Amino acid sequence: MATATIALQVNGQQGGGSEPAAAAAVVAAGDKWKPPQGTDSIKMENGQSTAAKLGLPPLTPEQQEALQKAKKYAMEQSIKSVLVKQTIAHQQQQLTNLQMAAVTMGFGDPLSPLQSMAAQRQRALAIMCRVYVGSIYYELGEDTIRQAFAPFGPIKSIDMSWDSVTMKHKGFAFVEYEVPEAAQLALEQMNSVMLGGRNIKVGRPSNIGQAQPIIDQLAEEARAFNRIYVASVHQDLSDDDIKSVFEAFGKIKSCTLARDPTTGKHKGYGFIEYEKAQSSQDAVSSMNLFDLGGQYLRVGKAVTPPMPLLTPATPGGLPPAAAVAAAAATAKITAQEAVAGAAVLGTLGTPGLVSPALTLAQPLGTLPQAVMAAQAPGVITGVTPARPPIPVTIPSVGVVNPILASPPTLGLLEPKKEKEEEELFPESERPEMLSEQEHMSISGSSARHMVMQKLLRKQESTVMVLRNMVDPKDIDDDLEGEVTEECGKFGAVNRVIIYQEKQGEEEDAEIIVKIFVEFSIASETHKAIQALNGRWFAGRKVVAEVYDQERFDNSDLSA
């Protein structure tokens, strides 16, 4: 079946204008396009023509769904573009205000020196966020490096040099973090660590020399604050949980986890400031590599002072929700203006799919296909579409101020939740809820114990793993559909993953097949396990078990 496309031309050049505006224009124009009247035929890309008198055929459900996704993607790109522009404008305004204040205080003409100093500090911060990793085993890939260095903080990028002849990397890489403290911890704790049978070398980039005076100045300024950096924080822990654990070492002035402005969830790291320097030293020496909820905390001294001027802030001091709403309105107006301009300057081809800018980029809000765990070699042969959307954000540059957006409130859900709790538990037998525990005043070892108990109350898994069901030679294109159809008898199947796991590095090593089935709710998972466990399939006795939800969500299929 031939695919219809929309071609947007501006001033005779295809794809003119900014990508978000053009994308929004194409989508909006596709809704308003009507077939021309009095035309004998419309020439398609494949050379065929269709009678205009008969009109265009209605869009299929798949095409309508694709169009809706394109609209959503175009709007998200427009909002993102507007937010970036607003952030840049706000930072420029802050710099201008600082310059004007310097003039008022009698510092002479500070424009050029101040701009130069700000640029030097930004370059120094960028260098401080990067570490060099050498002596990497040639069979190790970017995923393995990311997994090894991720506990120290969010990674912005990994740059590996590849040999175009051998198609293998050259044995070194550069890892860039969001904050300098993450890079400093990685430098201290990863040098000479065994990775892939080799002791890797971790150090600073070679161009750090020119920025060393600025780095020393930042470190000196940081000593005035008794701040520590905490990374690898469990996702289920809150600011108060971390504060209750760390206040055993002294009185805390502030404890804030950096949050994603889109989801409201913390990014796994934050900063704690004590009133006394000794408290911060004790916390670093005692809590580094402390096992909290199955994750080893990474704790170190902050190497930069708090710098709100270098932190991307919402325009005009607006709350994040208000800034996004303002950006959405701006993006909508931009899209309308783009449509109006396209109606005058551009010509439209046959309606159908969207421009290449929308088809080549992955739409926001889609879950990437699961990948195999780095420590367990294997091959994934089938993945069905996943259900929940994952928001995508642009990582900020420089030192991130952890005081960001707070999580969205769930006030509308509370009455329903309380009603369900009353039905499930009589008042005399009702367990103590987490919301009540969060307001308890605890510290020290008691705090650590309470936090661990909180983490033990995990969400039930919705994932079932089928073992000993098929041999690798029995895998074909129909297997995934057959499993989906069979498991659909027990509930809504979100996706099926067929995973082949090699039991060693040898070429003739045994390969076992695991089939992962994700349901919508945990009760459906248990229902399927009861029906399928011990059942015979093609002469093999199937083993059906619950699979750890956190492992599955992290694409770890090796258990």
UniProtKB/Swiss-Prot annotation:
PROSITE patterns: RRM. GO terms for biological process: alternative mRNA splicing, via spliceosome; apoptotic process; mRNA splice site recognition; regulation of alternative mRNA splicing, via spliceosome. One of its GO terms (molecular function) is RNA binding. Residues 77-559 are annotated as: Inhibits transcriptional repression, interaction with ERCC3 and apoptosis induction. Pfam families: RRM_1 (PF00076). The modification Phosphoserine is found at S112, S244. Homodimer. Associates with the spliceosome. Found in a complex with RO60 and Y5 RNA. Found in a complex with FUBP1 and far upstream element (FUSE) DNA segment. Interacts directly with ERCC3. Interacts with CDK7 and GTF2H1. Interacts with SRSF11/P54. Does not interact with ERCC3 in xeroderma pigmentosum complementation group B (XPB) cells. Interacts with ARGLU1; interaction may be involved in ARGLU1-mediated modulation of alternative splicing. The third RNA recognition motif, called PUMP domain, is atypical and may rather mediate homodimerization and/or protein-protein interactions. This is Poly(U)-binding-splicing factor PUF60. It comes from Homo sapiens. The gene is PUF60.
